[in-house]
A protein has these predicted regions:
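Active-site/acyl-donor-binding loops of N-acyltransferases
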Residues: 1-77, 125-128, 135, 141, ...
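A conserved beta-strand-loop-helix scaffold within acyl/acetyltransferase catalytic domains
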Residues: 3, 83-169
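Short, conserved catalytic or adaptor-binding loops enriched in Gly and charged residues
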Residues: 76-84
Length: 257
């Protein structure tokens, strides 16, 4: 939302929420990917058009530095404390209705202002979506499901980027979140050049950064509603709002051109 539009919305009673952070965890980078990134960055800058046409040279110059920076970031991320041995994590292609609904009920009590994550959402978002296939890391503590992380590998015609789509767990339960994230990264980091994620919760942001994710950009959503109760819900639960890549189309196909 443009700043002018946001100010108009706020004057009409709209509620601007805390930032949603976009993060990236680089694992490696190929010349093809770096070339693509350079073109994307410079294609709207006419005064640098000559550099766009010479990206092969720019890529060769920048590639060693990019790889060195990635190695340094991975070295620092390797110091992240290991997950708690009390948390057991398993991987699945699907989640059953009882497991998902039970966890959503507990999650909603902790994060009441979060967008719908009901079973209907699960089916619509993960089961019936065309083309895309999702994986699920499920965490248990004392045989009780305490968290689910949804992840996605790239399609063959996409950029080689894995996606942390959603984390359905108490954001402040760091043992669970750390275990889930570690399991998902074990899957994605072996084949993906990088992994992306989004979150609006500061506790999750800290866990992601500790795991080697870098902050790319952020933006602040604004809630516009004629319902007073809806506005109050967001105003009174600033710490209980969670946005991720499951909201909107933030995890959809990114074609590598």
């Amino acid at each position: 939302m443009a700043q002018t539009t946001r100010r108009m919305a706020e004057k009409l009673g709209g509620v601007t929420l805390r930032p949603v952070y976009q993060l990236l965890r680089p694992n490696s980078i190929s010349g093809r990917t770096l070339n693509y990134v350079i073109k994307e960055r410079l294609q709207t800058r006419r005064h640098l058009k000559w550099l766009v046409n010479a990206t092969g040279v720019a890529t060769q110059m920048l590639l060693p530095f990019a790889r060195l920076a990635i190695r340094a970031n991975r070295f620092l991320a390797a110091r992240t404390p290991p997950a708690s041995p009390l948390i057991e994590v398993s991987r699945h292609d699907h989640v059953d209705i009882d497991t998902w609904t039970s966890l959503w009920t507990k999650f909603k009590a902790v994060m009441p202002a979060t967008c719908d994550r009901s079973w209907q959402f699960y089916e619509w978002r993960y089961e019936h979506v065309p083309d895309l296939r999702y994986g699920f890391s499920v965490a248990k503590r004392n045989s009780e499901v305490v968290g689910i992380l949804v992840w996605r590998k790239p399609l063959p015609d996409e950029l080689n980027v894995g996606t942390i789509v959603d984390i359905l767990a108490d954001p402040n339960d760091l043992d669970v979140v750390t275990a889930l994230l570690g399991d998902a990264l074990d899957v994605l980091s072996t084949t993906c050049e990088s992994v992306v994620a989004r979150t609006s919760h500061r506790a999750l942001l800290a866990v992601l950064k500790n795991a080697g994710f870098l902050l790319v950009k952020r933006h602040c959503p604004t809630v516009v509603s004629s319902k007073h109760d809806t506005r109050r819900l967001f105003e009174n639960h600033a710490e209980a709002i969670l946005f991720s890549k499951a909201d909107h189309d933030w995890d959809q196909i990114h074609v590598a051109i």
